[in-house]
Amino acid sequence: MAKISEFERQRQENIQRNKELLKSLNLDSLSQSIKRELPRASETKKRKTTPRTKAVKKEDVEPSRRSRRIAGIKSELENPEEYNHKKSGSLKFEDKVIKSDSTEPEVKQEEKEELSEDIKNDNKVLHRLQALGDKFSAGDFFDIIQKNPIQYDDKVLQSTRDEFDKLKIYEKHNPLDIKISHTRITAINFHPSTTDRVVAAGDTNGNVGIWAVDSGEDDSEPTISILRPHGKAISRILTPVAEQNKLYSASYDGSVRVLDLNKLASTEVVYLNDPYENDDYALGVSDINFCASDANLLYMTTLSGSFHKHDIRTPFKPLKSKDILRLHDKKIGSFSINPNNTYQIATASLDRTLRIWDLRNVSKANAEWSEFENQISPHLYGSFSSRLSVSCVDWNSENRLVCNGYDDYINIFDLNEESLIPDNLKAFNKIKHNCQTGRWVSILKSKWQVAPEDGVQKFVIANMNRALDIYDQKGQIIAHLTDSVGAVPAVCGFHPTKNWVVGGSASGKVYLFE
């Protein structure tokens, strides 16, 4: 036998010692007991079977017979008024589903004609809805509404509709040739003049285009002049009542400038700086209006939700914190002054609210609602909350407000019926209107005609199906103008007095209906 090495001898001794240790611990018997406790892998659990129950057939229970005489129910002959009342509330096609007892051929023929006409009208509406999908406006159904005499009983409305039916697109030049700005139109203004008509429009690059509508008849091309008074998008263009030879324009670059139409020279009136930042930090101007009771007082709102007023007769000085009023914590898209009480203004904001303010009562206590510290606000009369942002608001001379926003509704408010402006404003009419403009179309904004010559209060708003919709102050549609419109005339407005309408598109072209 070969001699084992020292290492091998120690290894075998360790193995023997471990065996003796395991034996002393009695692990073999313990492992056997564990095995007995564990279920066998091959053994499967048997499912309990329950006896199948037979389905019990339900027997029809016939209703018990009851006497109408004992129950006190009168027959048709005994109570014809109640029968007729119930009959008038029946479903539209109930007589067709439930066979009519009428056997006279003339009655049957008349019923058949009425039903066929109803079905025809309903099918028209159904097909129109299917074609438009979920994004549609009430104006898309104008041809159906106009043909239905049941929808209105108003001679003034009918005559106004007849007048707007005569409106045609401007025919002197091809609408596709009337390009008034280089890029997408963001603001438009119809000058008050009725003889030498002028349309001005601003675009996203700060250009202002001026179109002399009634220039010489021999002109083969439209007479258009384009200037660039601003560095950013133009938010508003207006003509003061007292100075009709001037155009005021506001821009996101923080400035308000005045353009002399005779000299075509532009000068700066206001440059809004943020008082909480350095002087170079501009407050983008979102809207401007002149006060009706003081033609020199210019009201302005900003993209940050603040308000400022300035007398244009005095030189403008850099703003201080006390000069700014906080109206919203987010962008103010539009505001309007009450023509009857110029201390009242209405604002529409990205924060999904419309608010009415009293500019006479200004204090820090009025600004407790704001998330910003040390703010000053006017007194808040009341507000209207929307599901999504409110794009614009406009106030007419008969105390009606109109607003629209991304919730796809036009809301009309009547403040004549209220002795005091309520805390929570409620629209008396809501009109379905598609306002989903997307990235390449300017925001839709409804605008009243300032001083209608025919006495009919009306507003205009662009339709996403390349049209202009016109409504009266009750919310009844007057016109749906589509003639030769090649793009969505998103930015639109009335002539202040005449029933002429103009709209501007994303390509810088304008469509004039006269």
Curated annotation (Swiss-Prot):
Chain intervals for the UniProt region annotation (Disordered): 26-116
GO MF term (any one): DNA binding
Basic and acidic residues bias spans: 34-44, 56-65, 92-116
Compositionally biased residues, Basic residues: 45-55
Annotated WD repeat ranges: 180-221, 229-269, 280-320, 327-367, 385-423, 438-481, 483-514
Superkingdom classification of source: Eukaryota
Example GO BP: DNA damage response
Pfam name, any one: WD40
Keyword annotations from UniProtKB, A to Z: DNA damage, DNA-binding, Repeat, WD repeat
Keyword Disulfide bond among record annotations: no
A cellular component term, taken from the record's GO annotations: cytoplasm
SUPFAM superfamilies according to UniProt: WD40 repeat-like
Family per record: Belongs to the WD repeat DDB2/WDR76 family.
Function, as annotated: DNA-binding protein that binds to both single- and double-stranded DNA. Binds preferentially to UV-damaged DNA. May be involved in DNA-metabolic processes.
PANTHER family documented for this protein: WD REPEAT-CONTAINING PROTEIN 76
Entry protein name: DNA damage-binding protein CMR1
Annotated source species: Scheffersomyces stipitis (strain ATCC 58785 / CBS 6054 / NBRC 10063 / NRRL Y-11545) (Yeast)
